[in-house]
Design a protein with these regions (language model features):
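Class I S-adenosyl-L-methionine-dependent methyltransferase module
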Residues: 102-152
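Conserved AdoMet
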Residues: 1-107
């Protein structure tokens, strides 16, 4: 195997696919990141180019590898109370309008391994008193969802 550098054309293919699959827009500045994250997959399959890997994941026969590529190319940056101003806004402008006795529900999209939905849960527990509430967390990455389910 003699893997070549990620060409602009190949990068464009991954950019388009990731945008269509996940709504994630990759700037040109992310080209090295894409190459670095996918290089081990080229080695794993003995492929010589990122274009060959793109064909492999897009041919419909390797949906498991398609998910691996998606997991590798999503950021998964997470920590508790990651965007403090969002939580301030929730406390100051949303929670005061919650209907007492009616379940207050929030969805944490792109919740990674769970820190964001847990942060929401702590905020709701503190701010809603006896009003019932629920938080749903989801993510496009099966790898981080498995981590969240395991409690890590």
């Amino acid at each position: 195997m003699n893997a070549q550098a990620l060409t602009d054309r190949e990068f464009g293919q991954f950019q388009s696919w990731l945008y269509q699959a996940a709504g994630i827009s990759l700037s040109e500045a992310k080209k090295a990141l894409v190459a670095g994250r996918l290089f081990k997959r080229l080695k794993h399959y003995g492929l010589d180019s990122y274009g060959e890997y793109f064909k492999l994941i897009m041919n419909g026969q390797r949906t498991d590898e398609l998910q691996v590529a998606l997991d590798l190319l999503t950021t998964n940056e997470t920590y508790f109370f990651r965007e403090p101003k969002h939580f301030d806004f929730l406390r100051q402008h949303v929670l005061p309008h919650a209907t007492p006795g009616k379940t207050f529900r929030l969805w944490s999209a792109a919740s990674s391994s769970g820190e964001e939905p847990y942060s929401l849960a702590m905020t709701l527990a503190e701010g809603l008193g006896t009003t019932p509430w629920e938080v749903i967390g989801s993510d496009i990455s099966s790898q981080v969802l498995a981590k969240a389910r395991a409690g890590h």
